[in-house]
Amino acid sequence: MTLWLPASGKIYLPPTPPVARVQSTDEYVERTDIYYHATSDRLLTVGHPYFDVRSPDGSKIDVPKVSGNQFRAFRVTFPDPNKFALADMTIYDPDKYRLVWACAGLEIGRGQPLGVGSTGHPLFNKLRDAENSSERQEGTVDDRRNISFDPKQVQMFIIGCTPCLGEYWDTAPVCKDAGSQLGLCPPLELKNSVIEDGDMFDIGFGNINNKTLSFNRSDVSLDLVNEVCKYPDFLTMSNDVYGDACFFCARREQCYARHYFVRGGVVGDAIPDGAVQQDHKYYLPADQQNTLENSLYFPTVSGSLVTSDSQLFNRPFWLKRAQGHNNGILWNNQMFVTVADNTRNTNFSISVTNDSSLEKYDATKIREFTRHVEEYQLSFILQLCRIPLKAEVLTQINAMNSDILENWQLGFVPTPDNAVHDTYRYLASKATKCPDAVPDTQKEDPFGKYSFWNVDMTEKLSLDLDQYPLGRKFLFQIGVQRVRSGTKRPATRKVTKTVKRKKVQL
């Protein structure tokens, strides 16, 4: 017998208020056929690969830390296109449009030869080799060793008009009723922060805050021990509603476990058989081996072969469609280029002597130094675009970032309150109120608190694309042939004379 029964599931209805739809920049940005080329100077940096070298009193940094395992975060500033003197005045009408830049292509140039760098720690927390163990070894008070290894191989760059967002693991706040946490593993939480110039990226030990999670200062290499190791938060940036942080990215990571070691110290989480008597689920005890050795295993990774066949740099990239709603529009005339590359990770060894009369080798009179150098050059192809000053377009831009309209001098004027304000004349006088109480009228840089490698392109733009390597590649890519300059010589005409024959009358 068939019976009709009421539906047991819930009925989901759409939300009553309308969902705000974010438009893609392709829906309101009008692109022109005017392209500019911009290239930076050769960007060089030199420093110590493991730490900052400070002055004897520690008051200043004599040699900065420059490691091949650091992020390079470039903040590129372009000129305001609304202040350009364009030859075609029909393109720009300040009463109807505002001009913006769009990134059409770029090339991140890298100098210096390929090389594998070595990092390590003179007091690395390594009890013994866990792969080729010949005999049992009991831990002592200090089992640290001088260990060196090559890092995981990383090539990566992220392009956007806002800084790249990174993620790392750090200690989380402890609950109030948790009691004393001395000697216990702290809770962990995933945190986000902007990737700044000089931040360390992951080389095989994970993206964690080593300042708070490495008490012994010997679990990682010397260049990571006092740093926060970050990794780009691709999930958050790809789900950004406006898509400003990451137009597109390219990455290549490779590694393999080269050595297998055991940590020294007391095991925090003991194997359950020996701790809570779980009926020998993990091992069977013996009379001769009634105590277990350390079980904190870890590998040291290697980046393996470095070759020019797998390089992401020194080659052009063209932006046709970005992954988010922002299809390459450079709001506020700036671009952020975040680069990670340790395939040119050679550390120089420099030796000097403190005895000018030394003629034979004496290690006690020779001082060894190490330095790391990096070389970059950034090139861009910019497309000139215009935005119509329509109400619906300005409303979305104002909701996205009101600073854009202020820079365009289109800020919304508030309703006057008809109040009389006080203006003091002598602010530095002791008879008036403290000048610090006067509000600062200077506009604050939203990214001023972060550290970037600033690259000024305000005087680096050119319309002659065929005069630059990236420009010639772009012209070839879009199928534009170069016009040969110069005056052509007229071809010589060959004049032939015809001879008339006289008629002879017979």
Swiss-Prot record:
It is found in: Virion; Host nucleus. This is Major capsid protein L1. It holds the Pfam family Late_protein_L1. The keyword Disulfide bond applies. Belongs to the papillomaviridae L1 protein family. It comes from Human papillomavirus 23. Keywords: Capsid protein, Disulfide bond, Host nucleus, Host-virus interaction, Late protein, T=7 icosahedral capsid protein, Viral attachment to host cell, Viral penetration into host cytoplasm, Virion, Virus endocytosis by host, Virus entry into host cell. One of its GO terms (biological process) is endocytosis involved in viral entry into host cell. Forms an icosahedral capsid with a T=7 symmetry and a 50 nm diameter. The capsid is composed of 72 pentamers linked to each other by disulfide bonds and associated with L2 proteins. Binds to heparan sulfate proteoglycans on cell surface of basal layer keratinocytes to provide initial virion attachment. This binding mediates a conformational change in the virus capsid that facilitates efficient infection. The virion enters the host cell via endocytosis. During virus trafficking, L1 protein dissociates from the viral DNA and the genomic DNA is released to the host nucleus. The keyword Disulfide bond applies. HAMAP family: PPV_L1. Self-assembles into homopentamers. The capsid has an icosahedral symmetry and consists of 72 capsomers, with each capsomer being a pentamer of L1. Interacts with the minor capsid protein L2; this interaction is necessary for viral genome encapsidation. Interacts with protein E2; this interaction enhances E2-dependent replication and transcription activation. One of its GO terms (molecular function) is structural molecule activity. GO terms for cellular component: host cell nucleus; T=7 icosahedral viral capsid. SUPFAM superfamilies: Group I dsDNA viruses.
